[in-house]
Structures are given as structure tokens and as C-alpha cells.
């Protein structure tokens, strides 16, 4: 039986770390003039995938 393919969209969005998976925040690509500076600052950087979603991400990336 052939190997299962990873979901390429998920592979672009999530990275495996020692503590789980990291991802970038949404709503930070365009039409940012309406958004306050505070909101844009809060959306900077990466965050961890919520523990309830880790199993889904692992299944999409074929981790385990």
C-alpha cells in the first residue's frame, strides 16, 4: 500500500515544535487600514495550536 500524503495546505500553515504546533494569526494579510494599531500588534508573531485541535493537525500532517 502506498504512503499516505500529507495535506499540503496544512503543511504550509503548521510547524511542529517541541511543545506542539505553531501557526500564524489570521486576519493579518490585507485591508489593515480599518484595524487599530493595537489589534495589528496583537496579531504579530506565532502562537500554539489549541490542545483540542492538536489531534486534527497531527492527522493532517501524518505525524505519529
Swiss-Prot record:
> Which InterPro entries has this protein been placed in?
Ribosomal_bL35, Ribosomal_bL35-like, Ribosomal_bL35_CS, Ribosomal_bL35_sf
Q: Which Gene3D superfamilies match?
A: 4.10.410.60
UniProt signal peptide? none
GO terms, biological process: translation
Give the CC-aspect GO terms. cytosolic large ribosomal subunit
Q: Which domain of life is it from?
A: Bacteria
Record's keyword terms, sorted: Ribonucleoprotein, Ribosomal protein
* Positions of the UniProt region annotated as Disordered: 1-23
Q: Looking at the Swiss-Prot or TrEMBL record, what is one Pfam family this protein matches?
A: Ribosomal_L35p
GO MF entry, a single one? structural constituent of ribosome
Task: Give the UniProt family note.
Answer: Belongs to the bacterial ribosomal protein bL35 family.
For this protein, the record's PANTHER family field holds:
54S RIBOSOMAL PROTEIN BL35M (PTHR33343), LARGE RIBOSOMAL SUBUNIT PROTEIN BL35M (PTHR33343:SF1)
Protein name per the record: Large ribosomal subunit protein bL35
> Whose protein is this, by species?
Stutzerimonas stutzeri (strain A1501)
Amino acid at each position: 500500500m502506498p504512503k499516505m500524503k500529507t495535506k499540503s495546505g496544512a503543511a504550509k500553515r503548521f510547524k511542529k515544535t517541541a511543545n506542539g504546533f505553531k501557526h500564524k494569526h489570521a486576519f493579518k494579510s490585507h485591508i489593515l487600514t480599518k484595524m487599530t494599531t493595537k489589534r495589528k500588534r496583537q496579531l504579530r508573531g506565532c502562537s500554539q495550536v489549541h490542545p483540542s485541535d492538536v489531534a486534527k493537525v497531527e492527522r493532517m500532517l501524518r505525524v505519529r
